[in-house]
């Protein structure tokens, strides 16, 4: 079974608005590496549609973009992409797949079928999956910004505090800090896995 890793850009005050992040070569390289290491991407419908509206054009060369962004786009095009949605059934973007029905069952099956791990990049969906205790690791890029507005992580709340263990913290040149935490499990401490190996924004 692969790990489910939640990764997202977040400001110091918890804002996950993608326009508030620092989009430079280091941050794109960070997410490209995570995508390379993981076996699949997992998004909610809103994030999928945001990504679908831009990245396929970059991958085709129809939109201008720096080399780091183009590398990300080409690799994303080839990566299996899974979407949780109760409103939309058709997902024509290359290698896109729909997760329908019971959320716990569908995501657990995806984890079981993806030994390299699944990379989750939707904040609202992450809240739902955390309520189901399905997230194993968290790899956040914490940006040196105070946005003063939402949307924010976990703004709809969790039933209880989530206990995590720090694996590593790596500062980037821009002042962004790459934080890696794993979920604490009472039966065996933290979940297995080291370093940055293992399994990029908003909800359904």
Where are these regions (language model features)?
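Enzymes that bind and transform nitrogen-containing heteroaromatic metabolites
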Residues: 1-204
């Amino acid at each position: 079974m692969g790990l489910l890793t939640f990764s997202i850009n977040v400001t110091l005050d918890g804002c996950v608005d993608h326009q508030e992040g620092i989009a430079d070569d280091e941050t794109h390289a960070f997410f490209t590496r995570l995508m390379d290491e993981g076996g699949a991407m997992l998004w909610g419908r809103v994030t999928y549609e945001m990504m679908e509206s831009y990245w396929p054009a970059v991958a085709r060369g129809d939109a201008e973009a720096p080399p780091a962004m183009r590398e990300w786009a080409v690799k994303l095009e080839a990566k299996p992409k899974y979407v949780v949605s109760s409103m939309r059934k058709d997902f024509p973007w290359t290698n896109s797949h729909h997760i329908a029905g019971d959320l716990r069952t569908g995501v657990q099956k995806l984890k079981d079928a993806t030994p390299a791990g699944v990379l989750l990049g939707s904040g609202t969906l992450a809240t739902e999956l955390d309520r189901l205790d399905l997230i194993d690791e968290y790899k956040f890029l914490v940006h040196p910004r105070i946005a003063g507005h939402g949307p924010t992580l976990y703004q709809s709340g969790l039933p209880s505090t989530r206990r995590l263990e720090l694996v590593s913290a790596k500062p980037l040149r821009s002042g962004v800090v790459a934080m890696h935490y794993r979920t604490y499990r009472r039966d065996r401490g933290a979940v297995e896995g080291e370093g940055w190996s293992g399994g990029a924004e908003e909800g359904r």
